[in-house]
Amino acid sequence: QADFSRVRAQMEKVRTDPTTPDTRLSDNPNPFNPATPGALVQQMVGGLTPRHGCPLHARVRYFDPVAGRPGMPEGVGALVEKLEADSMTVTLVNTDPTASRDVVIEAGAYAEHQFTGVRIDGRETAIGDTSLGVHLAPGAGATLEIDMERYVNAPTFAFPWDR
């Protein structure tokens, strides 16, 4: 709710800006930026919004292995439902009704954590790695209960498929 209030307040500042285009500096819109990623960071990666150049501390990070880039594949959503000291629960959903999607989940924002196991629909699988792959059928979702050891690996910017 706080994030939505901030967006509304920022947009009101834009609408009531008394300056004219010919007197406005090029960076004038910066104080009015309505982007508010806090809730998205908390709900998708289980982290806190980084402030003032600080690194992102998060439980997971997502990659699109087909596009070879960081981030979610098109049409895939994630919701972190629960965080414990050594585990988390996240639900992934593929909103595309006709195409499947693959997602790589990394342990931490920089692979600093280690996945030890995952439970999906009651089936448990041991992992022992900094990432895991999930295949989502068209229009399907999955709730993953992931066990992890936190801050046991040296952080890296390398993509999961380059390690």
Where are the regions a protein language model picked out?
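Surface-exposed beta-strand/loop patches in extracellular or lumenal glycoproteins
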Residues: 96-111
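Solvent-exposed residues in well-ordered beta-strands and their adjoining turns
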Residues: 93, 108, 147-149
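Catalytic domains of carbohydrate-active enzymes that cleave complex glycans
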Residues: 1-89, 95-98, 144
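Extracellular/surface-associated beta-sandwich interaction domains
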Residues: 84-86, 107, 114, 152
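Glycine/proline-rich low-complexity spacer/linker segments in large multi-domain proteins
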Residues: 155-163
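A short, polar/proline- and glycine-enriched secondary-structure boundary/capping micro-motif
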Residues: 101-102, 154-156
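Intrinsically disordered, low-complexity Pro/Gly/Ser/Thr-rich segments with frequent PxxP/GP/PP motifs
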Residues: 116-153
